């Protein structure tokens, strides 16, 4: 107990810090098997190209989830590869929308992959707790699970992986963070 030397009032009791729910960053692990990956290859790296693509997808009522853009200056022509995920039922429609934009936007090709899953760890304060993403990636690497895309927010870290590894990844993350 820490007390004032100027009076006899009760002081403050100082004790060892106890663990609380705030210490538990990850509250859940999920696997979404209903995702598909779309990549637009060789999109000229110019203002407005990505906006045109995502506006067209939005007008077709296609929800886009994770987005990754890789810029390249190979051959002296700045281009980008744009990869994103959509719900599997929207994949065919997304492909048609993109093909309708190919001549206008000048990209090389579109590829799709339905054999992916999205594994997420969910909790409060992901950004304010260092090492959560590193631990997630280490757990997945130890299981031989390759990460294709990564997305982070204040409450969630998600990765796109091969669908065949989904259950194994989810179990390993559950064991690492929740048991």
Per-region residue spans from a language model:
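C-terminal catalytic "cap/lid" subdomain
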Residues: 1-152, 156-179
């Amino acid at each position: 107990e820490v007390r004032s030397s100027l009076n006899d009032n009760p002081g403050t009791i100082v004790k060892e810090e106890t663990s609380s729910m705030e210490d538990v960053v990850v509250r859940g692990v999920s696997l979404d098997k209903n995702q598909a990956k779309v990549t637009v290859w060789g999109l000229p790296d110019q203002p407005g190209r990505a906006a045109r693509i995502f506006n067209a997808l939005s007008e077709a009522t296609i929800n886009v989830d994770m987005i990754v853009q890789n810029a390249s200056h190979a051959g002296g022509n700045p281009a980008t590869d744009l990869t994103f995920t959509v719900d599997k039922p929207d994949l065919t429609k997304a492909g048609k929308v993109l093909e309708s934009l190919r001549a206008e936007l000048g990209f090389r090709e579109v590829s799709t992959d339905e054999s992916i899953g999205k594994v997420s760890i969910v909790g409060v304060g992901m950004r304010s707790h260092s090492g959560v993403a590193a631990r997630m990636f280490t757990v997945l690497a130890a299981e031989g699970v390759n990460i294709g895309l990564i997305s982070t927010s204040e409450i969630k870290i998600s990765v796109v992986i091969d669908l065949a590894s989904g259950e194994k990844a989810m179990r390993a993350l559950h064991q690492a963070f929740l048991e």
